[in-house]
Amino acid sequence: MRNSVKKWGVGIAVFAAIVTTAVLLPQDKVTDFHEKYEGTDLTSDIKGMERAGTYIRYIAGHDSSVRPQENVNIELFDYTSAKDVERYTSYEGVDEALYTGVDSTVTWQINVPQSGYYNLYTEYLIPESRGVVAERIVYINGEIPFESARNITFSRIWTDGGEVKVDNQGNEIRPTQKEVFAWQKAYFRDDRGYEAEPYLFYFEKGINELTLEAENEPMILKSLELKSVQDMDDYQAYLEKQPGVNMTETGTSYQQIVQGEDSTLRSESSLYAKYDRSSPTTQPNSVTNTVLNYVGGEAWRSAGQWIEWNFEVPEDGYYNLMIKARQNYARGSISSRSVYIDGEIPFSEMKEISFEYENDWNCMTLTDEEGTPYQFYLKEGTHTLRLEATLGGVGSILEELEDSIYRLNQIYRKLLIYTGVQPDKYRDYNIQQVYPEVIEAMDLESKRLYKIVDEMVAYSGQKADNIATAQTVAQQLERFVKNPNKITLEFTTFKDNITALGTASLNMSATKLDVDYFVVSGINAPIKVEKAGAMAKAWHEMKSFAASFVVDYDAVGDVYEEGDEGVIKVWILTGRDQGTILKSMVDDTFTPDTGIKVNVEIVAADALLNAVVAGRGPNVVLSVGADQPVNYALRNAAEDLSQFSDLQDVLSHYTASSYEQYRLDDHIYGIPET
């Protein structure tokens, strides 16, 4: 009896301890490191460890409050020197335009009426070329003002090259992408996204020289000017400038759903429509067929990338905006977007809207801090909504982190010269005496990193794995300062931690996001918030599981019965995107021209051998290793291509060395893949 009572007592005590821990743990405050860097001037530099040429230093070199209010137009054809340029007349609706080629350098003399900071602004068109962004280097009075002015980028415009097709299995096939050659307006900005605002360029009063040098891609300029720096209106100022209207019930109850996959324009060809079967609330939805139902994903990750949609409103008035999006890529991170309506950010709050980490879709109405929906004034007719990836508040933190990584590499290189790659752990290098500035730099950099950790945690609300790397380096530097003898013992680890910090910085600059749809609605229209419950998710998984027994997810495009005469089975060992492109090319040209039907299937590389042994292999396989054709030929499992009379015609497109590895005893068993 006593043993039973004793056991019950121990059990109750353990249970009480668990409950107490569960209650108290959530109340713990997230500790910060402010005590480590408070009172320290983190802007100071250690001689020999500073980073020159940064944008922050450039801005600090002049009075940033001097911002003239007058724009300065630059006459494009009044250049003082130029190379690889041409004057166009009557081009794309413009009377005159200046073509600047891939090797171009153009210099203008500008009479600036007042000293101060200006934005550089241009209207441009990128003609047909390699399909990548255009890049220009900016010189002011013969000098590059700051390092990142070496890489000013200008995006292209892409759209769908046709309608969405449906194969004979009911699967949607996305159209190819084609480029749109149209005029665009752009400020000169930070292509990394660290600076959310356009770059500020300082010009002295009087005659100044401005030079644009091409890094790649031609550009055609319609206009170029120095724009006065203007502060954007906040929401209240925006509302005060809008007219008062009496909307009818048609307008106040209006609602239009625009699917994410129906975007009209995009900045890169990779931002096309995708399909998702993971959530029951994705619209439209199918567990058996490939249905294009969202846009974004891994490709929509870099600052400056944008996607644009068209929408309509029935009358002049005020409308709300809701975006159904998902950020399930990085726990502890925030993906941000700038909202443009008809090419302009309507008010300052739309410079950055944030999507926090969540496994499922999040229906987010654009609201103020109190939860009141923003009202956007729109005139009757068609409008555009553009979402542009931005780093937002995290950009300045990442800029500090990049500077810190640069200085850490300087510290490492200085020590490397002295100690070598593998320091002798039994030798006292007296680093604190030989390089006292290195110890001082380590102490300062440790405090800077602690501050960066605090800033990132304050921004995101939690400490993610990537920023924890910065804390690891800060703690290591702190150990080095307290005991310099540890430097040589942990030298390899120090190098690895710097590398890991660089990787973490790249990961944190990725701002991925999916968009299912957005809703434009009148101010009285109810907005349905879709959220999948446990039962809906369970039913969705059951349907997906059942479908896996009857649906061939490996097949791509139109599928023909293998018993049909003249059907060729082709296996491709890469991804579905490559398979879809191949199947589209086959169906568009090869099958109509030859009458030969082709089934394309996506197959794992390790399945090929088993299939061949079982007698169920393909007629053609693509993307195999270079050694495989001969390996299969040795076992009489590959076809000798030498028997075909037109083989030499095919091989004439290749150099002999490219297919020599597929030769065995004067027979050819494979063709290079291009």
Identify the meaning behind each predicted range:
Residues 4-11, 19-519:
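Extracytoplasmic
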Residues 146-147, 347-348, 599, 640, ...:
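A sequence-level detector of short linear motifs
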Residues 546-564, 628-674:
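Hinge/lid segment of periplasmic solute-binding proteins
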Residues 109-111, 127, 227, 310-312, ...:
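Structured segments of extracytoplasmic/periplasmic soluble domains
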Residues 524-566:
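Disordered inhibitory propeptide/activation segment of secreted metzincin zinc metalloprotease zymogens
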Residues 564-632:
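Early extracytoplasmic/lumenal segment of secretory-pathway proteins
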